[in-house]
């Protein structure tokens, strides 16, 4: 009816209907931003919340739209999201009152009585009702401290207020669309004309306090402390309207929106009295700021009232923040940036990537420190972002994909090859430097940023970082893995182990969504680690009685002692993960039963627990087994001796493990037969050498033809046929044989190590999870989400048999996806680190001076090996060896900051452990704060300067 609000978008707020409408809207709906002389099309998020404008719209609401919007571009059109937002927020009578109020002019109660002619009690109630809704704000900013009401601008203003109370937003989701557009559309043409300081528009970045506390040239308004002093005792924490809005539209960042924004002064009273927040102490404000910095959130202050007033300090996630979007989408940093610019001291920088990962603007990227031949023997110059200051600017200069583009970590020309080659992208150069300085705790913490199992990997990793090491072009690669093993030994001692702190994007201390991880192998353990670090209490279901998967039941204990696994699992347990052993999901409990228990997401990482046979006669005999079963029996302590002759079929690292175990269990003859030539063998050269040292023989170029049995049905031998080719011309596995060239060998047992299989059992019964080649689960390659939305997969069940470090990397990414999945309205893809690393060209690098020391080698204790053949016998580096080896690192990489993109937030300085990045006050003009009412003069003055530069080509 004409005088009433339309509640809840005609009932469309019901979540099921919204989800289906959201999916339909995203399928193909676009919207057009229109302004004088331009048109720009983009996905129309939130379109499902905006019904068509009625044939006969409410006249009072149409007038209110005209009164509160259409101010800069003077549009003639009536936009649906504006109309419906005001229609749901205001009665016609309220709209008429609002249209009588001038924007940003305060009115006391007597003034409102005079303005409207309404009785005092009636108008006061209406004003309070509209304040509660968010159409008005109020303060006491007058000499008499009399309450006065203000019709705020839309942004920052009523658009935020409409989104700040979650219950109201859920009832009226069109408010989310309104806020999203009100903070973008009106600015789309004006942004290139915005001068340094922001011209009284929106928000302004204020640096991390400790990043500028020593800056002698700073001015008070650049310090958070200045504003906290100014509003001492008047603080309130409130819901972040940007996070709430984006979440409703399905583009949330998985942050809990509550309590990230800090209202100050009279605004604190407003948000508390209108149920948008609660009072906090100064110490609580500090805690919010600290936690925001830990999470990589940008501090911003309101910038519409000049240099003597703000009303909020926000802690913003660039993936959802509409204020930061103004500078990032339009590539116009004047709308955000502070007076400061980050600068890197390359001599100190070790390309750890911490500053890159946290930079909201994509200003910091990894590059190289080594000189380049192509650059004339100098360090390469890196491109800078073009700016609108002296350039014509339209939508072709915008960055609509900025949330992902800003998360690309590396310049195209590349960075340190070790970090690039590592599947987990561990900061190798960084932890080598920390180890060189004796800062072992910090080195371990840095490693665990990407690898929660460094003690394990220090023993079993296939060392792709070393294969890529630039030092290998000089003499021998740095012994990276041995240094990592030395550092990670600290995890084996409760007194020195590193248990990471929880860094969670919620002020509630953690998240209560239940997440099930199925399988306690490296992928599952990694996922559990990073979910626990994010504030969850994941539950790990493991069908065996011990954790580790193939780490425990596949890798020989003389390579990886099981107490190492237990020590690193204990860290994950201390972080809050729960382990339930002896539970096979699908048999003992189903996924549906776990859902009924409240589990919201599942990470399936059960590995490849089965083996494969060759399909030849005689292989079904009792003494023929597959490698994974053989290794499981040995590692479970069920095999004490293995007399006689053991023949191993296969040439990979698993086959090597079988052969070495057989040698140590007393087999009088152990021989491996593989299809490949010696040069083609999958097993590494080092692994082959160790097997031969143990007494194994290796015969290359043979494939199994038949297993021979004696009269009792027991294995007595096996015949092989000559393999003439393993791969076809396309590189596909297609072995060919010479059937006339045969070789028979005696055998008491045969172990097939020619592949592994996935044993699903009933785990996926009734699910939509698709299976591909080799029965591996099908999933999105970035998010690891399957066709069953709450099921994610990783490790060998997705890739097939691979290495522990690959599974660890996958588990980390799955944790990111699962965190986003279980948080309402979050996107799984937008704004996550892209993991797009590129290695510098080692052939182009100029290497002139370096430490001439040779590569250190870990001591092998042969006496211990003889006395205890199933105990580790390769010793850890000494501290002296670590110092010598880390000195061999060439320090290939460094972070590069583009000053044109830097917004001066200072977050990079909070992450650097090397004091290599600082803020310099290079742009003092960016601290020019003016009132909103000075916007047009400020824009006009700067636009004139800019036009002159463009016309005459000045910079």
Ranges and model annotations:
Residues 6-18, 22, 26-27, 63-65, ...:
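Ferredoxin-type iron-sulfur electron-transfer modules and their immediate structural context
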Residues 104-116:
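Short acidic, hydrophobic short linear motifs in intrinsically disordered regions
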Residues 116-132:
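Short amphipathic alpha-helical interaction segments
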Residues 131-142, 364-365, 917:
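A short, conserved structural fragment
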Residues 145-184:
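Short, amphipathic alpha-helical interaction segments positioned at domain boundaries
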Residues 426-429, 435-436, 477-481, 517-585, ...:
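Beta1-alpha1 glycine-rich phosphate/pyrophosphate-binding loop at the start
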Residues 487-508, 534, 567-587, 611-665, ...:
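Glycine-rich dinucleotide-binding loop and its adjacent helix/turn
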Residues 563-612, 625-642, 664-774:
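A Rossmann-like FAD-binding core segment of flavoenzymes
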